[in-house]
């Protein structure tokens, strides 16, 4: 796809504590590479990737492909950047929430991150995929899989164990998030009612229309 040759531009936000591997996960997804020497993200950065999304119909048939331009925003996890990070929440359509399987505190802080999303995202029930990262460091693991899955079930969100080092489940997690977003859009009767985190190729976007749709009970926020 050439520049501008897409149906939707969709913004995802990766968030979580500092050092959980957000930058490495996004780099692995967009470039297929791992760099263990990334410096800590200061403020906000982003990466991009073009994908084709095909939804399965009720009869199992694969629908027409939608050309998607993904913007994957990488946020600083440090507390001193929190106000800057939350300012970007409302502009994102989906959220990849990461914690470090070798760092229990990063797992305990997941609840705080979800609370922040519920307060600052475009609606109180945004689409989130939870990722326990660094699954390749099995000998250093301190967070049990059943605990992580239990937390994800409590919030009703998908859970993946990922590794930026070898790429395990990274594409699957982001594809799941994209699928949630596209299905939310499909639940809107009028496809012009799409949040700011989604931009059509003609540049049109409207949070006001999304709010109107929510008030009428049309859109699935």
Swiss-Prot record:
It is a lipid-anchor. Its EC number is 3.6.5.2. Keywords: Acetylation, Disulfide bond, Endosome, Exocytosis, GTP-binding, Hydrolase, Lipoprotein, Lysosome, Membrane, Methylation, Nucleotide-binding, Phosphoprotein, Prenylation. One of its GO terms (molecular function) is myosin V binding. Its main location: membrane. The modification N-acetylserine is found at residue 2. Disulfide bonds join 123-188. Small GTPase which cycles between active GTP-bound and inactive GDP-bound states. In its active state, binds to a variety of effector proteins to regulate homeostasis of late endocytic pathway, including endosomal positioning, maturation and secretion. Plays a role in cytotoxic granule exocytosis in lymphocytes. Required for both granule maturation and granule docking and priming at the immunologic synapse. This is Ras-related protein Rab-27A. It comes from Canis lupus familiaris (Dog).
């Amino acid at each position: 796809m050439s520049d501008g040759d897409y149906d939707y531009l969709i913004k995802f936000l990766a968030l979580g504590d500092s050092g959980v591997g957000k930058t490495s996960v996004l780099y692995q997804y967009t470039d297929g590479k791992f760099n263990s020497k990334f410096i800590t993200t200061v403020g906000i950065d982003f990466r991009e990737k073009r994908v084709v999304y095909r939804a399965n119909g009720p009869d199992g048939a694969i629908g027409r492909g939608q050309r998607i331009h993904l913007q994957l925003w990488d946020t600083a996890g440090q507390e001193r950047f929190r106000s800057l990070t939350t300012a970007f929440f409302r502009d994102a359509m989906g959220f990849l929430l990461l914690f470090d399987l070798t760092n229990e505190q990063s797992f305990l802080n997941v609840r705080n991150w979800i609370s922040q999303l519920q307060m600052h995202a475009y609606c109180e029930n945004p689409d989130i995929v939870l990722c326990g990262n660094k699954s390749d460091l099995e000998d250093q693991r301190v967070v049990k899989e059943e605990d992580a899955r239990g937390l994800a079930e409590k919030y009703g969100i998908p859970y993946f164990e990922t590794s930026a080092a070898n790429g395990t489940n990274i594409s699957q997690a982001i594809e799941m998030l994209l699928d949630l977003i596209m299905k939310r859009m499909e639940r809107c009767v009028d496809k012009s009612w799409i949040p700011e985190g989604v931009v059509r190729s003609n540049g049109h976007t409207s949070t006001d229309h999304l709010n109107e749709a929510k008030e009428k009970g049309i859109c699935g926020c």
